């Protein structure tokens, strides 16, 4: 069931034996009215750093159960003086979470740090209220100050080891992958929790970045099938929307990252709900 303010709760009755042996992060949960059953990725994630009981385990379990990840900039939430309209930003985030979004990442290199921190002061507690995750991009200092759940980097940013040195063991770490070699490296890299494959289609949010098509999602899915023990969560990203979602799903993707499909929607909650309906439970 979904508790007050959208918080994730266990779904259905649990046998005493199952309840005794399964940490909360490993039990079936409902998010926005949809059930997530535990899978090997979630079970593996739940015990990585702290025996399946601490904040890192809970975050990784939530990431493994995630299907819909939204990246947003802050431009449309800025007032004329450059400060953040926190109420408008909060309304957007809450609508997205109600629609079934699992992760919201703030990604805007054009704003001051003070604006980013103001956004995270809204996002971090709101994500927690909804049983979802907050994410930062590129700047580990901002991520540390904001106390986000997830930190995402590109291929030329901080290494995983550097991120861990700055952020500690409990923050979920992700990376963007644009080639088959990068996908293979991400699957094997110690300390990296998830990766993204793309951009599948060209997108104005990443100008100059050539589209890679469905080749990388197909590769990631094939590698998971061949080596389930080496699997970790991955998301298809780049130009994904409701119309293209069936193609991404056919390539083997079970998780997606979207930008405009939700951020530019007239009704972000409805847009998120439509996307979530096309993804697995």
Q: In which residue ranges do the predicted regions lie?
A:
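Position-driven detector of the extreme protein N-terminus
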Residues: 2-3, 25, 36, 44
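Compositionally biased, low-complexity flexible segments
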Residues: 3-23
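Intrinsically disordered, low-complexity polyampholyte segments enriched for Lys and acidic residues
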Residues: 6, 25-26, 49-50
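Glycine-rich phosphate-binding active-site loops on the catalytic face of alpha/beta enzymes
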Residues: 155-162, 196-208, 245-275
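Glycine-rich anion-binding loop/nest that anchors nucleotide
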Residues: 196, 234-240, 257
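Substrate-recognition "cap/lid" segment bordering the active-site pocket of phosphatases
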Residues: 206-222
């Amino acid at each position: 069931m979904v508790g007050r303010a959208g918080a994730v709760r266990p779904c259905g009755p649990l046998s005493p034996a199952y309840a005794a042996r399964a940490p909360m992060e490993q039990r079936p949960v409902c998010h926005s009215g949809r059930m997530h059953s535990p899978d090997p990725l979630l079970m593996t994630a739940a015990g990585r750093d702290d025996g399946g009981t601490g904040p890192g385990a809970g975050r990784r379990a939530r990431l493994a159960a995630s299907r819909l990840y939204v990246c947003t900039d802050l431009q449309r939430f800025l007032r004329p003086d450059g400060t953040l309209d926190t109420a408008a930003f909060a309304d957007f985030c809450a609508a997205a979470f109600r629609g079934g979004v699992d992760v919201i990442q703030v990604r805007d290199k054009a704003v001051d740090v003070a604006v980013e921190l103001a956004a995270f002061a809204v996002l971090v507690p709101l994500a927690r209220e909804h049983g979802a995750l907050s994410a930062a991009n590129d700047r580990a200092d901002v991520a540390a100050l904001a106390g986000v759940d997830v930190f995402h980097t590109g291929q030329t940013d901080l290494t995983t080891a550097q991120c861990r040195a700055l952020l500690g063991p409990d923050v979920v770490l992700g990376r963007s992958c644009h080639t088959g070699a990068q996908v293979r490296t991400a699957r094997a890299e110690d300390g990296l929790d998830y990766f993204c494959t793309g951009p599948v289609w060209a997108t104005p949010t990443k100008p100059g970045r050539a589209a890679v098509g469905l080749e990388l999602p197909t590769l990631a899915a094939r590698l998971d099938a061949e080596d389930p023990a080496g699997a970790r969560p991955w998301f298809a990203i780049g130009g994904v929307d409701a119309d293209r979602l069936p193609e991404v799903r056919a390539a083997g993707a079970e998780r997606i990252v979207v930008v405009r499909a939700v951020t530019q929607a007239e009704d972000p909650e409805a847009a998120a709900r439509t996307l979530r309906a096309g993804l697995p439970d």
